[in-house]
C-alpha cells in the first residue's frame, strides 16, 4: 500500500497483476462480514489497509494471449513487440461492449466477491461474427466489470473520491487503463513505480523509521504520477448498463457452475 501511494486517509489503489485487488488507507477498517475483506495494520500510524481482491485478472488476459490470440502473439514476437500491445491495438478497434459479448474471468474459482469455489470463466453472448478482437476486448472489459463490483464497496466507504492509483503489469496497457476509467468513472493515475511497489514500501519504512524522511508522504516525491487517463463521458452509459447485466448474469451462472462441477466429478 505504501509503495503504491496509499499513505493518506481515503487514498485508494488498484493493483492488477496475476490477480487483482483494490485497497484503501483509512483510520477505520472496512468491516463487512458478508464479503470478509482482508484487513491489515498500515505502516502509517493510525491507519488500516482494507483490501478486496479477485483471483483471476492478468492471468485471464494471459490465457487470452496464449490460447485465443496465439497468431497475434507470434506476430508480435517476430516484430519485437510486446504481444499484449498488439492484442490491445486489435481490441481497441472494437467498440465498447465488444458487440454484445461478456467475459467472466473467474477461471480459478471464486474470490472475495464470488464466494462459490466452483465459479468458472465464461463467455456470454458469443455470436458467429465475433473475432479474436471481440474476445480480447471482452476479456479486458469483463475483468474490469468484476473489479467494478469490488470498487462499489469502496465507494460506500469513501464516497467522494474521483481518482485512484493503478499499479502492476495491468497499468501498462493503454486500452485497459481507458476501459477502467470509463467503467469506474474515475481518473486513473499511474505512478512512475508500478512493478516494484513492495520494494519501495520497504524503503519507505526504513527511511521513515531511521528519521531520514518525515513521513510516508515522501512516496509522492519518489513515485510521481506519470500518466492520467480521464473518463470518456460518451462511453460511461454503455458501461453502466453492462455492469448491471454483468452482475445479473453472474448471479444466474452461480448454480450452473456448481452443477457442472458436480457432473465433472462423475467423469
Regions found by a protein language model. Give the residues of each.
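Conserved active-site beta-strand element of glycosyltransferases/polysaccharide synthases
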Residues: 13-14, 23
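Glycine/Thr-rich phosphate-binding loops that ligate phosphate moieties of nucleotide
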Residues: 24-267
Amino acid at each position: 500500500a505504501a509503495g503504491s501511494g496509499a499513505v493518506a486517509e481515503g487514498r485508494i489503489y488498484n493493483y492488477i497483476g496475476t490477480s487483482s485487488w483494490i485497497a484503501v488507507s483509512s483510520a477505520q477498517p472496512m468491516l463487512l462480514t458478508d464479503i470478509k475483506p482482508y484487513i491489515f495494520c498500515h505502516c502509517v500510524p493510525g491507519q488500516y489497509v482494507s483490501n478486496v481482491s479477485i483471483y483471476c485478472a492478468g492471468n485471464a488476459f494471459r490465457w487470452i494471449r496464449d490460447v485465443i490470440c496465439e497468431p497475434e502473439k507470434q506476430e508480435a514476437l517476430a516484430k519485437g513487440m510486446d504481444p499484449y500491445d498488439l492484442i490491445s491495438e486489435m481490441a481497441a478497434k472494437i467498440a465498447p461492449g465488444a458487440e454484445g459479448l461478456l467475459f467472466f474471468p473467474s477461471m480459478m474459482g471464486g474470490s472475495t466477491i464470488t464466494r462459490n469455489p466452483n465459479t468458472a470463466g465464461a463467455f456470454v453472448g458469443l455470436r458467429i461474427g465475433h473475432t479474436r478482437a471481440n474476445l480480447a476486448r471482452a476479456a479486458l472489459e469483463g475483468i474490469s466489470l468484476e473489479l467494478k463490483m469490488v470498487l462499489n464497496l469502496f465507494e460506500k466507504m469513501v464516497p467522494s473520491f474521483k481518482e485512484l492509483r493503478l499499479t502492476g503489469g495491468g497499468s501498462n496497457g493503454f486500452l485497459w487503463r481507458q476501459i477502467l476509467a470509463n467503467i469506474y468513472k474515475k481518473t486513473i493515475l499511474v505512478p512512475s513505480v508500478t512493478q516494484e511497489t513492495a520494494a519501495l514500501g520497504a524503503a519507505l519504512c526504513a527511511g521513515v523509521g531511521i528519521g531520514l524522511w518525515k513521513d510516508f508522504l515522501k512516496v509522492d516525491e519518489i513515485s510521481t504520477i506519470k500518466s492520467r487517463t480521464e473518463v470518456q463521458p460518451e462511453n460511461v452509459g454503455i458501461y453502466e448498463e453492462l455492469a448491471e447485466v454483468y452482475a445479473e448474469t453472474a448471479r444466474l451462472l452461480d448454480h450452473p457452475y456448481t452443477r457442472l462441477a458436480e457432473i465433472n466429478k462423475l467423469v
